[in-house]
Amino acid sequence: MRRGLLSLLLTCALSPFVAGQPGTAGSGVITGRVRLTAPPPGNPIIRMGMDPRCAEATRGKRVVQDAVVTSADGGLANAFVHLAGSFPDAPRPAGAVTIDQHNCLYRPRVVGARVGQTIEFRNSDPTLHNVHGLSDASNEFNVGQPVKGQVFGFQLKREEVMLHITCDVHRWMTAYVGVVDHPYFAVSGEQGTFTIDAIPPGRHTIRAWHERYGTLTQSVDVAGGNTAVVEFIYTGSERPGPQR
């Protein structure tokens, strides 16, 4: 009996550790912040007079193209943060991701979604919008939405960081979708902070993308039951790659 127990314990001790498989030490968490150390540039003012309905919806408001949104201490919002690599055991997505067309702007401006997941565009304005996905990865679409309340759904086909969304009717309207084939992503909030949970233990490559400043990459070690902290720092000199 004792010999059998000893043999079982020895077998368990010598078994290889495989990240992401059921029965490992448990998942971990990555939390962190995206910062801009340079003074933020001024965002251009949007002139909506070309569409009377857009102009009426924003009357008396100063509407800007919020490409760079920072907190008082440099926290950078709207950065898409994600793990690189393949995670075949990750749970499949449930439900759709929604982007609203409200007051002639896309809201939110940056979202994340998974391959195979549906992204929905809702027209909340009493005017014609056109949802145009500019893709290099078979995620292309171009659909008119002339009626308030109309919803268009598209099932994302392939990974793409990032899928650029425009409106051919209102050229100032823009949004971005980070499409990955796993659930390990987040978008930085108003203070530049983000959290990604339920991550398989191990060493991972993590990336942050921002529409003005491009992509930063680093490695992070995640231990089961623990939280790893990372920080992405943009100096303001970075430039993104070509965008359609």
For each feature predicted by the language model, list its residue ranges.
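Bacterial N-terminal signal peptides
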Residues: 7-16
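Extracytoplasmic copper-binding redox domains, predominantly the cupredoxin/blue-copper superfamily
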Residues: 21-244
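Positively charged n-region of N-terminal signal peptides that target proteins for export
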Residues: 1-4
